[in-house]
Amino acid sequence: MGPYRVLRTLGAGGMGEVYLAERADAEFEQQVAIKVVHGGALGGAMHSRLKLERQILAQLEHPNIAHLTDGGSLPDGRAYIVMEYVDGIAIDLYCDSNRLDIAARLRLFQTVCAAVHYAHQNLIVHRDLKPSNILVTAAGVPKLLDFGIAKLLDERQARQHTLAVTHADIRIMTPDHASPEQVTGQPITTSSDVYVLGVLLYKLLAGSGPFVITSVRLTDIERAICERDPRPPSQAVNTDDSDESRSIAESRSTNPKRLVRTLAGDLDNIVLMAMRKEPERRYASAQQMASDIQRYLEGRPVIARRDTWSYRSSKFVKRHWLPVTAGTGAAFLVVAFATTTYLQSLRITAERDR
């Protein structure tokens, strides 16, 4: 691949393969990651998406975002991009293997928020902020990777790529790390990344995700993400004496009961505010979310508040209006029947007593 010699395969996916490579022209020693798109029927669309990713990466210069090094085309016409090679592990595995406590996890997460906010300032939405796309080096530096399904918010730039990538871009997502807007095909804004940051923080804190999604059917995914309210992270932590519960707590340098107490309250509210179904009710930005976490770390009041009972009830009725209406009608009929029966019995008793 040009001046690069492939050493091994790092991974493969729907768009193509990623290789570890090094310079082969003796100019200087450098290991890089090279992404090559698939050929075949979707080759044209994937080629356009890789060009878009190259354009996106070229705009980003941030210490916590893997930077673009080079790019080109192979003799068979397939495009490739050359990126900084990040020798690290997924952020959730890094936190667990290093037994980071909750405060350390929050500080690491704040660094990720800063990188995401920087991308947003450059009118770029990542759309795939899962743990495997955020690697942490041995030095503890997180690096945001894979802008392969990112979205440009600049209409003039986006218009140049829209027609070419439309068919390859239909609801591309990781289901358990997707926002309601992604699942339903609604317009994507920076708020979508804020939602997924909430999902990521949920897992870093509680050791599991907010939803268990085993089906690949879109209707099942929509039902899970768009209709069900996630449990607060503190309620996702088991306080039993199982090996799994102890393992999750110990990887956070605590015990299950203390972990629940730590998460309950402000941290629950921070995560749930980021994950609200309605984009306008989430944090206004990744930076605002990071700032609220800082308030928590400093022992100051946070802006996140738990939804009121009346609000949750109204949203439940809106989502399930048909069964609620039917149930309310049935309950009314039961009450009306019982009231009528009771009044009739009173009249019969009164007449008998006369």
Please tell me what each predicted stretch does:
Residues 33, 81-82:
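Conserved hydrophobic/aromatic residues on the N-lobe beta-strands of protein kinase domains
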Residues 20, 29-38:
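Glycine-rich ATP phosphate-binding loop
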Residues 38-59:
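AlphaC helix of the eukaryotic protein kinase fold
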Residues 17:
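Conserved N-lobe ATP-binding subsite of Hanks-type protein kinase domains
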Residues 12, 60-63:
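Conserved N-lobe motifs of Hanks-type protein kinase catalytic domains
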Residues 22, 51, 55, 65, ...:
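C-terminal lobe helix-coil module of Hanks-type protein kinase domains
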Residues 307, 315-354:
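Charged/polar helix/coil "stalk" or linker segments at domain boundaries
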Residues 90-100:
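AlphaC helix of the protein kinase catalytic domain
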